[in-house]
Amino acid sequence: MKVKARTFSGTTSNEVTQREIANRALARKAATEGFVLLKNEGHFLPAPKGGKIALYGAGAVKTIKGGTGSGDVNERDYVTIAQGMKNAGYEVTTEGWLDSYVKVYDQAREDWKAAILKKAEKMESPNAFFEAYSSTPFFMPCGEKIDVDAAKADGADTAVFVMARIAGENKDRFDKEGDYFISEEERVLLAQVCESYKDVVLVINTGGLMDLAFADAFDNIRSIVQYVQAGQEGGNAFADVFTGAVTPSGKMTDTWAKTYNDYPGAEVYSYKSGDLTKERYEEGIFVGYRYFDTFLVPVRYGFGYGMSYTDFVITAGKVSVSNPGTMDPKVSVEVTVKNTGDTYAGKEVVQIYVSCPQGELVKEFRRLAGFGKTKLLAPGEEQHMTITFPLYQLASYSEDQAAWILEPGKYGIWVGNELNTSVLSGALELDQEAVMVQCENICPLKEELKEIMPFAKKVQARELAWHEELKAKGIVPVAVKAADIPTEKVDYQKIPEVLPGRAGEIVEQMSEEQLVQMATGDPGKDQGNALGSAGISVPGSAAETPLVAAEEPWNVASIALADGPAGLRLKKEYQVENGRIVPTDFLSALEGGFFAASKEKRGTSYYQYCTAIPVGTLLAQTWNLDLVRELGEMIGHEMELFGITLWLAPGMNIHRNPLCGRNFEYYSEDPLLAGMMAASMTLGVQKVPGCGTTIKHYACNNQEDNRMGSDSILSERTLREIYLKGFEIAIKDAQPMSIMTSYNLINGVHAANCYDTCTRAARDEWGFAGAIMTDWTTTNVQIQGECTAAGCMRAGNDMVMPGMEEDHENIRKELKEGTLDIRELKRCIYNTVNIILQSNQYEEAVSYENQFDGLGEWLTVK
């Protein structure tokens, strides 16, 4: 195999390329499909094109395109909502207010910068700056009050008010004014806007949810748009939806509660419990809509909710079960969707929920089992769809049996365009219990945990009610026989005596020291151990694998890894002098170089402009798997262009609580939706030869405060059904090249050192074939317990990132003492080398997905 010759990444030309233009157009399309229209009183939107418009709020001119930290992208430029409205032909009447806001904002940013630098000086951590930065969130200033009389006379009837919030890794949000709640200054400003203009459109430019009770007090807020954070083309995309050039089709991927305290465990989440060392998952499986729907708690906007400019009628048809007697029985639901409006074309999302029988295992009232998005339907046009999903999607986990089981009884099938209004449309009936997968128990609890449960009588009454509804509708359940459902028995593997293939040959030829070096990344002598910018050959990349086996007979290339998940995070400009890259520090790669000291440029400049796509939550709100797959392929081609092999994305943890600082990176409160989005993104990226994704953060990364020392305490059933399920789906449906473990502990064991999740679940149960890596500095910053590099090797966590000499010392020490078996080390290096040999660093690279059968078939729509 021939390793590609290394060249400097990017281009010496600063001209906008056709690649940038095309990719921005796709990012814009994705944003338009992800915006959720929450309110549209009197069909106020779409608004007439052109004319005068008033813009207020922090996000109008300082629109937040994405979150902070490793999820940020250093794009060429981005379009604010204000610029997008101007591009659409509107005359903005509030230029004076916007200009004054920019000055207020810029000063606030400088003050924030100074506070962080001062805080970092007092810290002794090797990652002092990043810790100071990520633990000191920037709160958007409100802006000045307005002159009501002047505003009334500015000629605009409509005002757009953009609420904005910033969040990022290492710090959870606050349930206080100015964050989850509207600040008093914002309330006063909004009241002035509502007094000054006839009609107001409220835009929510946040990475997560916020309390919207304030909106009820203003009668002339006609429309509310959930904008989230829409990437670099967000402003243009908003104008597309505002004017009706695109009909909104986004749907909520979370439940928007009436009040924060309605969320289960709200009062003890993260810092609110007073103990950041333990996070007790007492809500069990009742997360998000599973809680609200089961416990009958009223909500503001339900899971799957979203309005359109047109109307649709969804008619459910035949329900069937296929592939009996195989390991993959399927359920299919036929649906017809018709656009019954007379003006606007639009897309609709069909959602299928299932009520599983309440037997020995108490279950949620309904769970998402399948979904599909229509094509663009003209007025009067209809589309016939068959949505097919695995029967396994309806299985529940029994800890007593250590098995995924289907309990006997009726399985009600609900069809609609959101959870709360879905209609009981069909059913299955299983004659007796079926064991679908026989496993072994993993991640046992080490202390007592009492989970909430619904009242048994209410559960039984609701189940009886929908059984009676089936009879009243004349629906005859489709009979399913347990005898037609074979049991898959997991074969838990031992380390093979002989490692297979070319990768095995190479590993067996390596010296012990080469193996030790290959167990970590190579941070680079010039870059230090900076979080997220330890790459050498591709400036701004997160890390590289070492070159200790680059010569014959091994010929193992070094691969570069880049952060995400809203696009590739690289330095958009770097310099080359005398044939060498001029070294820069971490600050130059953060927030577009905002924190870096000004330096004179030396040598020739190279440019790496990557596309900033919408954040994960907004992508999931599209409910469009084909579109996400197309975005993945786009990112794969950018990886190919800049020499990146592994994209450290997608992020796919569950939205357990709206205050999690990193929710913007993740998709949903539902594991099926999260898993399918990650699978689709992976299938797109990995279509490009030698490129791969890194699904993260595995697992239970549901809070950011004390993320390296927090112990997620939860039952095995909750772990498997909610927090591992999305990863399971992504692996089985897309086979990502790699997985990144999380910082936290799971029932007392560090995720990076957890054999149960890294090996028994991912590899033995789900068939994962790629490499696993730690998150950055997992083994170097200890808060609770000890997480070691040797512990990673024992667990089957193959790459310690970004790689430090102390990691090598730890591995050498444990090999010498016999607490680490050389075969355990070789197994990990084999997994890494196996991926490297299939990377885009070789001339002969092909699509990684080619070697697997049955990918992309978990959920199909025809």
Regions found by a protein language model. Name each.
Residues 1-396, 405-419, 438-862:
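Glycoside hydrolase catalytic-domain context in secreted enzymes
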Residues 421-438:
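Short beta-strand elements
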